[in-house]
């Protein structure tokens, strides 16, 4: 059986001459007390019959409340620790991280309590320089930063179009 597949967007911008990427911190109790190594790209499962780029844009909107209208540029595919494959796409754009809104998921919490609680899929978003991202990003997604640096000259500078 092939590993599960997901897709996501690495949103980037040039700010005062420095490349920055938008990363998100997942919500919920598992991630509550984690910071270093907990940040990642907005991503989620590819639905049956859905193209990876479409899934990446859909998941970005679900997890940030922001619709991207630019065509995503294929970036890289990475394998996460649990075996899930993540197809990542790069999009140049800008958004205010304080305005994100995320869909929620439900989980039994505390474990074995019989109580179900809802948590946002994304608790927080933050623009980071590549150096900051290398410190805070989930280890399995770090190759995405190198891939972005390598393909940056190929990506059109048409400007981002992140829209709420």
Task: Provide a role label for each language-model segment.
Residues 1-40, 89:
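N-terminal strand-loop-strand
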Residues 130-164:
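Charged phosphate-binding loop/patch that engages nucleotide di/tri-phosphates or the phosphate backbone
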Residues 77-114, 126-128, 148, 154:
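Active-site-adjacent beta-strand/loop module that shapes the phosphate/pyrophosphate-binding cleft
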Residues 117-123:
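Non-DNA-binding regulatory cores of transcription-related proteins
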Residues 16-18, 28-31, 47, 82-83, ...:
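Short, charged/polar surface micro-motifs in flexible loops or helix N-caps
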Residues 46, 68, 95, 100, ...:
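Hydrophobic pocket-lining residues within nucleotide cofactor-binding pockets
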Residues 41-75, 129:
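The catalytic Nudix box helix
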Residues 4, 36, 41, 69, ...:
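Short connector loops at helix/strand junctions that flank enzyme active sites
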